[in-house]
């Protein structure tokens, strides 16, 4: 690995560390972790996930009642403002990283037109995940 590549990687890392996306992610995570109700909602959700995992591991089908409980729990998680803010910040940070990875993949593939590395044309060329 050349010194030039490492230097550029360090510059990129510093830019990511200073990004609004990372700052938002950290601040919303801190707020969510400090919120007792958010922590209880997360714990309840994790317990429900564990229950579903155990049912599936035993080969049992999920009943409508269990599915409704899961849906209600997901709505509660996504609807609680501190958790919702964190999830949105996490999504924005992930999108930024995906964009960076797409730029790197495009450069490595030596494709100046960016073919195959966008959500418009599909992600098969860069291995990214379009959502």
Curated annotation (Swiss-Prot):
Domain of life: Bacteria
InterPro entries for the chain: Bact_com_dev_regulator, Com_YlbF, YheA/YmcA-like_dom_sf
Pfam family, one: Com_YlbF
Family as reported in the entry's similarity comment: Belongs to the UPF0342 family.
Entries under PANTHER family matching the protein: REGULATORY PROTEIN YLBF-RELATED, YLBF FAMILY REGULATOR
Family matches, as HAMAP family: UPF0342 (MF_01526)
Protein name: UPF0342 protein DSY1594
Source organism (scientific name): Desulfitobacterium hafniense (strain Y51)
